[in-house]
């Protein structure tokens, strides 16, 4: 089932006003500064998040007020925090990405840090996902461009997936592989718009995220888009103890790993 993904200008306020019941808002000061004040004012509580450490997330789950919905407005950290709280509480979830630097708004599993390492937990569906282009376009252009990294990873992910399939360590699906390749080729065709951070590019990135997520659910694993480039990123963060802009780090990993693979690095 495709998610209820809504894309347009100035649509966030209407989407939140349609909710039946009350809500807890999870965000950060930066993203919330560009949002209609009526949205935080109507929330049962507004909760800031600054970490994906499991202990921090569990503390939020224990402390936030009871509500019918969790609404997340922000970047990848906010998306995963809101997903975690909604999953643990068993309540409905609304996600409104303020940036397209990472695919967290359309994925169902939840990224968290456990003992300093990125792991994935749970399964939750946001209904709806509200991609308000007015809000997203207000984010720094560099960060919106970074979103391409979580899609370019198809270049190296598919290569590694095929290697794994030949070694009988992962299931392969020709149709899903072909669909993933189409997503990648469309991304290259959109490169000028992505560089200019046009509305067309922002919508393309968020819809491509949703398409890829559907493919991963169908095949039952992340092989089509998560390979050595992602593991490079995880290793860098584990070794440095730092977080980086996810799309930029994965983009770097894709460039490096495609060179090692002999797999279209010049693109």
Regions found by a protein language model. Give the residues of each.
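A glycine/threonine-rich phosphate-anchoring loop and its flanking beta-alpha core
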Residues: 88-185
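ATP/NTP phosphate-donor binding region
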Residues: 1-69
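Short beta-strand/turn micro-motifs composed of small residues
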Residues: 26-27, 74, 131
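Short glycine-/acidic-enriched loop or helix-start segments at secondary-structure transitions
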Residues: 34-37, 81-83, 105-106, 140-141
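Active-site segments that bind and position negatively charged phosphate/pyrophosphate groups
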Residues: 175-267
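Gly/Ser-rich catalytic serine loop of serine hydrolases
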Residues: 72-78
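Short Gly/Thr/Asp-enriched flexible loops that form oxyanion-binding sites at enzyme active sites
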Residues: 78-92
